[in-house]
C-alpha cells in the first residue's frame, strides 16, 4: 500500500474515532449495545471456565507457592540468576518519560500542547509502554526499536483517560493525583488534546526502524485495539450497563467490558513489542495470550482497589464505580472471589510464558506480580 494512501486511511479513521468517542452517550450506545451483547461469548474465559471457577476454590500447586516466595519483594530468582524488578521498572519508566517528553510538541497551539503534556507527563505507572519494551526484548529485540510504539500506546492510553474523565462519560475530577485535564483546561481543549494524542500516536509509531511489512502489521494491531473491536466497544458496553440489575447480567458480560476497555491495550502493547522485536507467529501468539491475562488481571485488581482504598491512596476518585452503578467484579462475585480470581489469572499468565527462557521472561513474570500486588 502506498504511504500516502495509508496516511489518508489513518487520518479518516482518527477523525471518525475522535467523533465517536465524544458523541458516544447516550444515543449511539443504545444502537451499539445489541451487536456488542452478541459478541460477549468471544471474551477471554468461556462460560464453562467461569462457572468452574465460581464453583471451586483456587488451589495453588506447590510450584506456584514456591514461585510466589521467590518473587517476594520484587525479586525473581532461581539457581542461575537474580532479577530485581524495582530498578528495572524505574529505569524503563525513566526511558519512557524521556521519550514522551521529546515526542510531545511545545509550540503553537500552546493550549493544546500544554494540555497534552499535562495529561501524559503526569506521574503514571507506565505499565503499558514497559510491557511493550519487555515483550520486544523477550523475543530478541532492542529497547530503542520498540520505544516509538511504547510511546504510541501510552499516548492512546492517555487519550482514553482524558475521554473517560469527561462529564459525558465517567465525569471524574481526579486522575494520577491531579485534577483531570478538562477541569484544568476545559472540555473543549481536553477533547482536542485527546484527538491530537491519538493522531500523534500513529505518526510517532511510524518512526520505528522496522520493515514495512511489520510496520503495517503493527499499525493494524494498534488501530484495531482502539475501535469497535477494542476500547470503543468496552466503553460503549460499560456506559450502557450502568445501573443494570445484577440478575440481568452475567460474568461474561462484565468480562467483555474489561477485555475490551482495559485488557485490549495491554495486550496490544505486548503484541506490538513482539512484532517489532522480530518475534515468530508462535512467540507473538504466546505473548498475546499472556498479555490478555494480565490485562484482565489489571482490571480485577482495579475493581478491588476501587472498593478498598481511599482517593488519597489511589490518586483518583475512589468508590466512583459503585456510585455510578457500574458493574465490577466485587459487585458481581464478591470481594473474596475477586481476590481468588486474581490468583487464577496470575497463574494462567505465567503458564503462557513457559516456552521462553527463565532469564528473558523474568521481567514479564515480575510485572505480572507487580500488577497483581499493586496498591494504587
Curated annotation (Swiss-Prot):
Q: Which residues bind isopentenyl diphosphate?
A: 125, 128, 157, 176
Which InterPro entries does the annotation name? Isoprenoid_synthase_dom_sf (IPR008949), Polyprenyl_synt (IPR000092), Polyprenyl_synt_CS (IPR033749), Prenyl_diphosphate_synthase (IPR053378)
Question: Cofactor comment in the record?
Answer: Binds 2 Mg(2+) ions per subunit.
Function, as annotated? Heterodimeric geranyl(geranyl)-diphosphate (GPP) synthase large subunit. In vitro, the large subunit catalyzes mainly the trans-addition of the three molecules of IPP onto DMAPP to form geranylgeranyl pyrophosphate while the small subunit alone is inactive. Upon association of the two subunits, the product profile is not changed.
Binding positions for dimethylallyl diphosphate per the UniProt entry: 175, 261-262, 299, 316, 326
Any keyword Signal?
yes
By sequence similarity, the record places it as follows: Belongs to the FPP/GGPP synthase family.
Organism of provenance: Arabidopsis thaliana (Mouse-ear cress)
The name under which this protein is listed is: Heterodimeric geranylgeranyl pyrophosphate synthase large subunit 2
Q: Which cofactor does it need?
A: Mg(2+)
Sites where the protein binds Mg(2+) 2: 164, 170
Amino acid at each position: 500500500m502506498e504511504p500516502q494512501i495509508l496516511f489518508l486511511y489513518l487520518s479518516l479513521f482518527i477523525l471518525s474515532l475522535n467523533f465517536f468517542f465524544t458523541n458516544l452517550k447516550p444515543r449511539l450506545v443504545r444502537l451499539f449495545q445489541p451487536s456488542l451483547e452478541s459478541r460477549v461469548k468471544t471474551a477471554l474465559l468461556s462460560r464453562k471456565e467461569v462457572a468452574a471457577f465460581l464453583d471451586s476454590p483456587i488451589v495453588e500447586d506447590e510450584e506456584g507457592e514456591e514461585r510466589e516466595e521467590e518473587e517476594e519483594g520484587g525479586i525473581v530468582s532461581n539457581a542461575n540468576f537474580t532479577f530485581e524488578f524495582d530498578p528495572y521498572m524505574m529505569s524503563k519508566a525513566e526511558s519512557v518519560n524521556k521519550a514522551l517528553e521529546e515526542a510531545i510538541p511545545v509550540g503553537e497551539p500552546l493550549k493544546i500542547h500544554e494540555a497534552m503534556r499535562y495529561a501524559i507527563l503526569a506521574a503514571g505507572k507506565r505499565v503499558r509502554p514497559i510491557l511493550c519494551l519487555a515483550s520486544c526484548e523477550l523475543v530478541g529485540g532492542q529497547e530503542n526499536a520498540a520505544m516509538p510504539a511504547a510511546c504510541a500506546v501510552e499516548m492512546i492510553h492517555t487519550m482514553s483517560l482524558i475521554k473517560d474523565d469527561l462529564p459525558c462519560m465517567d465525569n471524574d475530577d481526579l486522575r494520577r493525583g491531579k485534577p483531570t485535564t478538562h477541569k484544568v483546561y476545559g472540555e473543549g481543549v481536553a477533547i482536542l488534546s485527546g484527538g491530537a494524542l491519538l493522531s500523534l500516536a500513529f505518526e510517532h509509531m511510524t518512526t520505528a526502524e522496522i520493515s514495512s511489512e511489520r510496520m503495517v502489521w503493527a499499525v493494524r494491531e494498534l488501530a484495531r485495539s482502539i475501535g469497535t473491536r477494542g476500547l470503543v466497544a468496552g466503553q460503549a458496553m460499560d456506559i450502557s450497563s450502568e445501573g443494570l440489575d445484577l440478575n440481568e447480567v452475567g460474568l461474561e458480560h462484565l468480562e467483555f467490558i474489561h477485555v475490551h476497555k482495559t485488557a485490549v491495550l495491554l495486550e496490544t502493547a505486548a503484541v506490538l513489542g513482539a512484532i517489532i522485536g522480530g518475534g515468530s507467529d508462535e512467540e507473538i501468539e504466546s505473548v498475546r495470550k499472556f498479555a490478555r491475562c494480565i490485562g484482565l488481571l489489571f482490571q480485577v485488581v482495579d475493581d478491588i482497589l476501587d472498593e478498598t482504598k481511599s482517593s488519597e491512596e489511589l490518586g483518583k476518585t475512589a468508590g466512583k464505580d459503585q456510585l455510578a452503578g457500574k458493574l465490577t467484579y466485587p459487585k458481581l462475585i464478591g470481594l473474596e472471589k475477586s481476590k481468588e480470581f486474581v490468583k487464577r489469572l496470575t497463574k494462567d499468565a505465567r503458564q503462557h510464558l513457559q516456552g521462553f527462557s527463565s532469564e528473558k521472561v523474568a521481567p514479564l513474570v515480575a510485572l505480572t506480580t507487580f500488577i497483581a500486588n499493586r496498591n494504587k
